[in-house]
Amino acid sequence: MSKGPAVGIDLGTTYSCVGVFQHGKVEIIANDQGNRTTPSYVAFTDTERLIGDAAKNQVAMNPTNTVFDAKRLIGRRFDDSVVQSDMKHWPFTVVNDAGRPKVQVEYKGETKSFYPEEISSMVLTKMKEIAEAYLGKTVTNAVVTVPAYFNDSQRQGTKDAGTIAGLNVLRIINEPTAAAIAYGLDKKVGAERNLLIFDLGGGTFDVSILTIENGIFEVKSTAGDTHLGGEDFDNRLVNHFIAEFKRKHKKDISENKRAVRRLRTACERAKRTLSSSTQASIEIDSLYEGIDFYTSITRARFEKLNADLFRGTLDPVEKALRDAKLDKSQIHDIVLVGGSTRIPKIQKLLQDFFNGKELNKSINPDEAVAYGAAVQAAILSGDKSENVQDLLLLDVTPLSLGIETAGGVMTVLIKRNTTIPTKQTQTFTTYSDNQPGVLIQVYEGERAMTKDNNLLGKFELTGIPPAPRGVPQIEVTFDIDANGILNVSAVDKSTGKENKITITNDKGRLSKEDIERMVQEAEKYKAEDEKQRDKVSSKNSLDSYAFNMKATVEDEKLPGKILDEDHQNILDKCNEIINWLDKNQTAEKEEFEHQQKELEKVCNPIITKLYQSAGGMPGGMPGGFPGGGAPPSGGASSGPTIEEVD
């Protein structure tokens, strides 16, 4: 295949989306199911690996081996409180591998474990394939988005996932920034405008304030809640209906994973319905112990169940405004992103907060981020189209970065919301006389003391010549590149001795070797998936051939046209094959093909003989001649047209 354009991928917590900029506009690409967003789900079964809709659709049957929310694990430590609290809610198992979380599943009868980067890479591979199927070209370059909240290791983990999926990640950009780009193309303005991006998706909530002036974006502030989204609204509905089931039927379904999963699917559907209707019905046959669950819910009740969550979305809005030092009256445009912003109550709360201001809903909220990422991909790969030419992008660091100084104080070198790329240098000294070295501990966070912030990594600068405290000069430099990835170095001015940090694995980093191994494994899994598809196709081919043959010779119009002995031979062989199929569902492709050849050896001569003697098949035989080689029709006009049926 020829080389295709760069794409933009919104790798979401619950759903992902891919877009491409071509023919002067962005096209959001639908998957093989016709959906423009694809669930970020990967499932493992005894026979195959499923990604996307196929994985999500079978989750009720296979909850422990269906993995989602990998984005919540990426770039985190196993003992991270977020990981620990999330694990309680997941039906799949997360294990500790040298301090890093891995997802453990049963796949093809074996226990396998995968890093979150590998799971995310499978979703990215799926998005890459969706784009390739649509474009008819290979896709290698991509811009991938992350929440504004993501720290350094989460960004790096996302980049690693791209590498494992065989993508060249041109840049990692913040989701709100991507939405702003999507928006910037729609509405060109000269004067400076302040934009508030309100992004409420399936799993995360981000509020960002940006300014746009003459096509130049600047992010002023970000705030949000990494744990609020559509799934939380689904959970409230699920709990409501579990309680209702208990009241009506005196039975508790909460311990039955499959029942809860089926209920959750119905709740998600009801929630979507309630964005356009004021009432939704739920009908689940045999939900628990054979009891059918038929009920309904009104929009008002749904709003009441989620009232605190809905209202709570305004707190980060206020925080973002404070950080940007803006009053709400100074916001020119409010942009809705994420499927949950379709909820009328959320739109109303936001509109009322901004004193009745109209909200911008012109961009499909599920697609806005991928849309902007696709534009950014076009810019970075040198698209000369005037639509993208005058667009420039300034991103920011989501959290302040600094080092620990005497007494555990956080000394900030780069303040949060600093435009990146950026580089800051500050000079430090020793704390005690004749101190031989300094420990540089790098933190991110907004608290005054480092113990309340997040340690990114540490390194030592040793070999400082003996000197009284306060004399040595140690220059510390923080350098952040355009992807938000941080390098920290320290130099002793007197000796020129330098050390810099490679933020190591205890930060949730994958080593080069790990990534290379995972790239190879990803290839292997892909090959296995294809082999599985071929196998199923030969199995189905044999299956339908045997059944069609059997149907042909059992046709009541046949007696007298075929020798009893031949008739019996075909029947015996067909039954033998059908029995063999029942016992060998998981045989190899070659075995299915071999069995089909054996069956054809018996059937073809007899059927050919039948045709030649009868001058064509008797009419009314279903579906024409079912088989491998189509023999000549004996020239009789009464016979059906013969076609191959696979």
UniProtKB/Swiss-Prot annotation:
UniProt-annotated stretches for the region Substrate-binding domain (SBD): 394-509
GO molecular function, one term: protein folding chaperone
Highest rank taxon of the organism: Eukaryota
Positions of region (Disordered): 614-646
GO CC term (a single one): cytosol
Gene3D superfamilies assigned: 1.20.1270.10, 3.30.30.30, 3.30.420.40, Actin, Chain A, domain 4, Substrate Binding Domain Of DNAk, Chain A, domain 1
Stretch list, region Nucleotide-binding domain (NBD): 2-386
Pfam families: HSP70 (PF00012)
Bilayer topology term: Peripheral membrane protein
Compartments (UniProt record): Cytoplasm; Nucleus, Nucleolus; Cell membrane; Lysosome membrane
Induction: Up-regulated by insulin in cultured embryos.
GO biological process: chaperone cofactor-dependent protein refolding; clathrin coat disassembly; embryo development ending in birth or egg hatching; embryonic organ development; gastrulation; protein refolding; protein targeting to lysosome involved in chaperone-mediated autophagy
Residues annotated for ADP binding in this entry: T14, Y15, G202, E268, K271, S275, G339
Biased composition (Gly residues): 616-632
Family membership: Belongs to the heat shock protein 70 family.
Role: Molecular chaperone implicated in a wide variety of cellular processes, including protection of the proteome from stress, folding and transport of newly synthesized polypeptides, chaperone-mediated autophagy, activation of proteolysis of misfolded proteins and the formation and dissociation of protein complexes. Plays a pivotal role in the protein quality control system, ensuring the correct folding of proteins, the re-folding of misfolded proteins and controlling the targeting of proteins for subsequent degradation.
Record's comment describing the protein's domains: The N-terminal nucleotide binding domain (NBD) (also known as the ATPase domain) is responsible for binding and hydrolyzing ATP. The C-terminal substrate-binding domain (SBD) (also known as peptide-binding domain) binds to the client/substrate proteins. The two domains are allosterically coupled so that, when ATP is bound to the NBD, the SBD binds relatively weakly to clients. When ADP is bound in the NBD, a conformational change enhances the affinity of the SBD for client proteins.
Protein known as: Heat shock cognate 71 kDa protein
Species of the source: Gallus gallus
